[in-house]
């Protein structure tokens, strides 16, 4: 399965432990396209419609016009995780390279 950095997919993130983000929700693929081509796993950040989360460090606002979702979203960059590509459900949309770059830069700040 070929996926691209910046793609948004619907995914079931269960099971979870503790404070991990779970449930059936959109995720943003942040893994680079070279790795996406060769690996069976993909690095993602979950999205949430809880706009209060935008005030936390390690988040990034994505408008519904950009995401293709029915609601504005917050990328929970601090909840980064690797999942098997078989978890990926329906493709939703793709964000701009500028937004992808901003998400990656926010991740670098967390590291």
Predicted features, each with a name:
Residues 14-18:
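Short, charged beta-turn/beta-strand-edge "cap" motif at the junction between a beta-strand
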Residues 22-24, 29-65:
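Compact nucleic-acid interaction/catalytic patches
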Residues 1, 66-111:
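C-terminal terminal-subdomain/extension
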